[in-house]
Amino acid sequence: MSAELIAVYKDEQIIDLESAKVLGLSDGVKALKGSEPIYFDDSPLALEVIRHSCAHLLAQSLKALYPDAKFFVGPVVEEGFYYDFKTASKISEEDLPKIEAKMKEFAKSKLAITKEVLTKEQALERFKGDELKHAVMSKISGDAFGVYQQGGFEDLCKGPHLPNTRFLNHFKLTKLAGAYLGGDEKNEMLIRIYGIAFATKEGLKDYLFQIEEAKKRDHRKLGVELGLFSFDDEIGAGLPLWLPKGARLRKRIEDLLSKALLLRGYEPVKGPEILKSDVWKISGHYDNYKENMYFTTIDEQEYGIKPMNCVGHIKVYQSALHSYRDLPLRFYEYGVVHRHEKSGVLHGLLRVREFTQDDAHIFCSFEQIQSEVSAILDFTHKIMKAFDFSYEMELSTRPAKSIGDDKVWEKATNALKEALKEHHINYKIDEGGGAFYGPKIDIKITDALKRKWQCGTIQVDMNLPERFKLAFTNEHNNAEQPVMIHRAILGSFERFIAILSEHFWGNFPFFVAPTQIVLIPINEEHHVFALKLKEELKKRDIFVEVLDKNDSLNKKVRLAEKQKIPMILVLGNEEMETEILSIRDREKQAQYKMPLKEFLNMVESKMQEVSF
């Protein structure tokens, strides 16, 4: 079965066997010249077809078990697929095995999956009385509506799909959740069931193993266990509280970045948290981003709490006149921003309403875009290497709706391509995926579980400089508009620390660990020695704690190990008298002895090992 053709890829779309027949091609997909074959396997394009068909298999099974069920949409998403539906029956996680069993029953029945195309009038009549399908149709333009059928079940869908349910043998329903109709909180709440599907048994097995590993590494769980952060309902959803250890971790990353930024010619700036709505109207945020912003009124003047830092940095630029000799100007800020995220999408530190970006804006000439982006790519590589992340880049090009002329866009896009080429970076191209005001590069990191995360962005902006009428005096003494480059490498400290926590499973490397060394005095008489050593380590900028609880030595050591502290030092008579320390080193997975002075020199050196 692995060699069977299930669809083709042509003109950036997947065309399944049934769609080829509907197009009137008697030989099916074979008649589609210049197309790329898609075989039944675990490749990305094949999985899109497989998972889409598995979503329909889920809907068919739900209809069989709950005849009153009505269905909204069932798309393929990054984590598999889901279907939104409603029924008068109460459905819980405990019902998933029963639904899954029904899916397997239909899969074994080897039902042919067929397609027909209806006019809008025919589709409205076919799904008469189904308000959810009518809601779907209201969002579709044109007069061609695809309907896929299998074993008496049919659903409105554009595809692509497998030719038969016999292909669907390796799937799993993963969770049940609620979802508002169309993602709008004003609409009714539907039931959403998620699932995953693969062509092979190995693919499903590996994925389920990864899911279990991800549960163990969940940063929300680690945040509590390691005392990094918390949330409080009395404060509000999506508003994290950084506890001392989490704040230390974050500060260490901030300090390392600041040192590197200053060496790379960035200047620290700081903008206000609230700005008059007038500037948000100039920037376009008021018209295009208002629903994601918070507003307040002071002295009858409306203010917007900033969702982004760019406007503040523009005003810093405008605070003085600039010549071409001043450029590039690089401003950075650890900017706190607020965005109104719907409660249903909030997720630990990964999705919050208040977060801090490692934000920077570079004001430069067109000719400087390539060199500035090249420097950012170099910076990115050093940061990712320090944290043991592999990463990939994606270049997004001009969308259909955009500002600026073709030559300007081509020049800006080529500058990004040349910068990527200079660093020998293989990158994907998202044709038409850029913002309306300029091309961009997205930075996607891969963690220890092979999960990909969108973090940083390098965005060329030709819109805001025009809106705010930014200028510099060029070498011919004429006013010229600068280009603005938005740049965040981590994205936000909250999101990056969540990813970092799961990547290392809380075993943070020494240079950023929230507690780097713990000192365990065996008895009270060793406590003074521990405090003196603590002071020596603090002078060397080491985060150190003395564990002097009234517990047994073994219990204190186990507690320190559970806290995933890189180095544990047990201090007794021998260590105090000889000043030769006993060290338990987590990173080396070893125990060894070292003279005090040598140890102090070693940890001092370890703090210098990493730089960006």
Curated annotation (Swiss-Prot):
Keywords on record: Aminoacyl-tRNA synthetase, ATP-binding, Cytoplasm, Ligase, Metal-binding, Nucleotide-binding, Protein biosynthesis, RNA-binding, tRNA-binding, Zinc
Residue segments, region Catalytic: 218-509
Function: Catalyzes the attachment of threonine to tRNA(Thr) in a two-step reaction: L-threonine is first activated by ATP to form Thr-AMP and then transferred to the acceptor end of tRNA(Thr). Also edits incorrectly charged L-seryl-tRNA(Thr).
Domain of life of the organism encoding this protein: Bacteria
InterPro entries the UniProt entry points to: aa-tRNA-synt_IIb (IPR002314), aa-tRNA-synth_II (IPR006195), aa-tRNA-synth_II/BPL/LPL (IPR045864), Anticodon-bd (IPR004154), Anticodon-bd_dom_sf (IPR036621), Thr-tRNA-ligase_IIa (IPR002320), Thr/Ala-tRNA-synth_IIc_edit (IPR018163), ThrRS_anticodon (IPR047246)
Protein name as catalogued: Threonine--tRNA ligase
Subcellular location: Cytoplasm
Family annotation (Gene3D superfamilies): 3.30.54.20, Anticodon-binding domain, Bira Bifunctional Protein, Domain 2, Threonyl-trna Synthetase, Chain A, domain 2
Subunit structure comment from the entry: Homodimer.
Enzyme Commission number(s) from the entry: 6.1.1.3
Catalytic activity: tRNA(Thr) + L-threonine + ATP = L-threonyl-tRNA(Thr) + AMP + diphosphate + H(+)
Gene Ontology biological process terms from the UniProt entry: threonyl-tRNA aminoacylation
Gene Ontology, cellular component aspect: cytosol
